């Protein structure tokens, strides 16, 4: 395992350095763990490619992604910043991406209780988001194992973290 026995902060630093060195990966956006933006601003705005949840060890990526969606929805981050192309999650073993548009409609639900704590995995809201992101990740995720799929991960980032790109180039392993 490439990132064995390290703390979450160190994991974020190493993933940023190893895979996103060509981008700005040092921004801290409210409670979002990890963000990747184009290194230059455009008309004073940053263009984000990724907002991600980072978890150490072998944390459940479905729970982590559900937590990220709840974090973004609770803070209404998408109202202050242009949303990224992708939402993602990584732990010490792998990284996974989903297109932001796949979950965008969750944020506009009228009857959704956004006051829940994103890390409380026992709420009806968490369960709803968890089931949704699990379904998306199982059928339409782009996931890569650190160490094993490094070449494919670098290719995915190079081909898809491009300003103005509206579709995803799938990378076959």
Locations of the language-model features?
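Acidic-basic catalytic patches of nuclease active cores, encompassing PD-(D/E)XK
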Residues: 1-29
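Charged, often flexible domain-edge or linker segments that flank or initiate folded functional domains
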Residues: 32, 37-57, 67-69, 73-173
């Amino acid at each position: 395992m490439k990132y064995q026995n390290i703390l979450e902060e160190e994991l974020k630093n190493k993933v940023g350095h190893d895979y996103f060195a060509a981008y700005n990966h040092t921004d801290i956006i409210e409670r979002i763990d990890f963000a990747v933006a184009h290194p230059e601003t455009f008309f004073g705005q940053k263009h984000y490619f990724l907002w991600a949840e980072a978890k150490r060890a072998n944390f459940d990526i479905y729970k982590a992604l559900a937590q990220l969606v709840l974090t973004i929805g609770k803070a209404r981050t998408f109202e202050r910043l242009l949303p990224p192309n992708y939402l993602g999650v990584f732990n010490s073993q792998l990284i996974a991406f989903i297109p932001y548009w796949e979950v965008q409609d969750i944020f506009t639900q009228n009857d959704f209780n956004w006051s829940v704590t994103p890390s409380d995995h026992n709420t009806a809201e968490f369960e709803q988001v968890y089931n949704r992101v699990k379904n998306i990740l199982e059928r339409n995720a782009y996931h890569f194992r650190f160490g094993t799929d490094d070449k494919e991960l670098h290719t995915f980032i190079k081909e898809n973290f491009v300003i103005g790109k509206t579709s995803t180039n799938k990378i076959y392993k």
